[in-house]
Amino acid sequence: MKTLVLLLCFTLLWGCQSAPQGTGLGFREVACDDPEVEQVALTAVDYLNQHLLQGFKHILNQIDKVKVWSRRPFGEVYELELDTLETTCHALDPTPLANCSVRQLAQHAVEGDCDFHILKQDGQFSVMHTKCHSNPDSAEDVRKVCPHCALLTPFNSSNVVYAVNAALGAFNEKNNKTYFKLVELARAQTVPFPPSTHVEFVIAATDCAAPKVADPAKCNLLAEKQYSFCKASLFQNLGGEEVTVTCTAFPTQANGVTPASPAPAVEKGIPVALPDAPPASLVVGPMVVPAEHLPHKTHHDLRHAFSPVASVESASGEAFQSPTQAGNAGAAGPAVPLCPGRVRHFKI
């Protein structure tokens, strides 16, 4: 009898520790494709994208698990496990998420996994706890879909550093007004044949005039940040090397009301004189960082790329209205099994 009593006590104690703080012990199960659950999940993804510090926006792919806990004295807490996919829109891109393309398998897709605790009270959602990480698809799986497609390459690869410097140099040479400085290397891929390196990066306007800058380290970013997102490719041909780069300006980061507009770009196919060997350093923000100090990673992991709510104990959270749900809301009634929910795009 004593053993049964002790077992019951331990069971209750474990339940108290595993439940989100401020909730009752009981929770109700809801279908992952329930319209209200999807509304909460879209709110969570919206929060994620609003707090991204670098990398690319993510979009909801699947709701894996959901529990709804009653919260004392009012409201309820949604405990969600979500799968997301990386889009082609950078974190600074003002394009609405609904208009962002999902990065496909052949483009070396990246999947995110997130846990959220979201309080619903008086018709508002407050994010109480977040925890995310992300991983690229394996090279083997990409090769199954597209044997000759470009694969993600570490940021500190000498070929990548070389390509970024060449592209930035070409951009500043073409732009005869403001000197731009690299602030983030967002993505890099290589193709063995024909030998080429493809990079995506963010630059910002400085107080220096282009194209001739003796010491880039002395150039400071403007008070009202003017960012541009660039895509560039460096091709190794029999006749030499060729770099192409195109950049798009984002609205000014202040009271910015200016719409996104094309920034000066190097026309495709213009050869650019390159140094004899890859440079030893790469300009990042206001500093010159040696290439060997760049991180040995192939993408910006959500674990480090966004600023989350620290823990479930910050119960005040950040209150905001949920985004408008677009498209089919899924099944209105409970499904069997309740979870996981439908896959909106594809699984990695």
Curated annotation (Swiss-Prot):
Organism: Meriones unguiculatus
Gene Ontology MF, one: cysteine-type endopeptidase inhibitor activity
Location in the cell: Secreted
Any one Gene Ontology cellular component term annotated for this protein: blood microparticle
UniProt-listed InterPro entries: Cystatin_dom, Cystatin_Fetuin_A, Cystatin_sf, Kininogen_Fetuin_HRG, Prot_inh_fetuin_CS
Protein name per Swiss-Prot or TrEMBL: Alpha-2-HS-glycoprotein
Keywords per UniProt: Disulfide bond, Glycoprotein, Phosphoprotein, Repeat, Secreted, Signal
Signal peptide range: 1-18
Disulfide bonding pattern of the chain: C32-C339, C89-C100, C114-C132, C146-C149, C208-C219, C230-C247
Keyword Signal included in the entry's annotation: yes
Modified sites of kind Phosphoserine: S134, S138, S307, S311, S314, S316
Domain of life: Eukaryota
Tissues where the protein occurs: Expressed by the liver and secreted in plasma.
Species lineage: Eukaryota, Metazoa, Chordata, Craniata, Vertebrata
Family, as annotated: Belongs to the fetuin family.
Entry-listed glycosylation sites: N99, N156, N176
Pfam family, one: Cystatin
Xref: Gene3D superfamilies: 3.10.450.10
Annotated Cystatin fetuin-A-type domain residues: 19-133, 144-255
Modification after translation: Phosphorylated by FAM20C in the extracellular medium.
First-listed, main subcellular location of the protein, grouped into a coarse class: secreted
CDD domains named among the record's database cross-references: CY
Transmembrane helix keyword on record: no
